[in-house]
């Protein structure tokens, strides 16, 4: 009996080590469940069986240093199944990944789950050090929230298509699945109009004049997002934030003439964007035409699109809008309408070292996971100030570190309290769960800074080892030559 107890104790210890070992693999976001096993899958000759993403899997094998063969004892097997047991939310993005010395097996309900499993495999490859082998393990994983995204305000400050693609591609490796494209602002209308080309004329832009996206570039970006399992949400802000529209047409959007023009532009937008949602803004404006918003929502819906709107903004009744995006502390989710939390998620307001702590620790809309009424979170860069270089836009907003923080929180769920309660300071107790969790995240994030973000604007440095000693003001009596005591 004593021997049995010792055996069970050792077995439990190794089981625990395998689970805790996931952190050593630098997976980000951390999977919901990860059990490590002994051994490695070595990439050599192997068979591939997959009903989806065949080209992507072939590329994966090549990048790992393997080759495909009709006959091999080693194999990669992708299986679409009806359900994965014990997944509480978002089955469509869930997956189970099993790696043994001879097989890699991915089980998922939909293509998206297969794609996220592949991103986990890429991270296992990168973290493992050796290019052609993967740690044996079983990972069961799913996102706590179905919307995990970022917004670029290109209406104020243009970003090249190449830069947008770079951000989308990089962040999809961390399971970010939504790109919100804020295309129009007071400064400029950045989407080409073939019906009204004067809308894109330099004379009607007050910042970065002449810079806009062609309709072909927009279509290409939609396709690029789809290839990376990212939902693109185009926003045409109305009736506020529309000075560029007024400069061009000499009509307010809420006027009869303005509404006629806007509907023609929406025809063009809906035809260009093969996406399910169109964002129509409706924030920070005085409504002078009570029919404007209901009529525009109905018009977009008749084009086969669902409509997203800011909150606070137009006061919708139940069923009048398909999704709301909360942009200030006054924004409130409503039963029956899915909500996106963007209230304290303004990267342009963030401090490099303080706010990332609050961002990582805070629960999304103070909830542990999403629901029918809580879709998720979108981080935003609002370019209120002109920053002329793309590099500086990304650097000064600390874009990538903050996006990795929200990538983990939106995927894992949970957290502690909310921004306005828990603050931006780490607890003094280094043994506390909050401190330990952030330290673990910081370690994994800095690993990616070193191994994946070389040459990219990534301003964050380690801070969990920094100790602050706050004292009273030094009584120098106004004499600046006095020396501060040791």
Task: Name each region found by the language model.
Residues 245-323, 327-334:
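Active-site neighborhood of glycoside hydrolase catalytic domains
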Residues 481-486:
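Aromatic, loop-rich ligand-recognition surfaces of beta-strand-rich domains
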Residues 90-259, 263-277, 295, 299, ...:
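Feature activates predominantly on carbohydrate-active enzymes
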Residues 328-478:
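Flexible, acidic glycine-rich loops studded with aromatic residues
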Residues 148-152, 179-181, 232-236, 278-280, ...:
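Hydrophobic faces of well-ordered beta-strands that scaffold small-molecule active sites
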Residues 155, 184-188, 237-241, 283-285, ...:
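Active-site beta-loop-alpha junctions enriched in small/polar residues
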Residues 15, 20-143, 270, 307-314, ...:
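Acidic, contiguous N-terminal accessory segments
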Residues 1-8:
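Bacterial N-terminal signal peptides that target proteins for export
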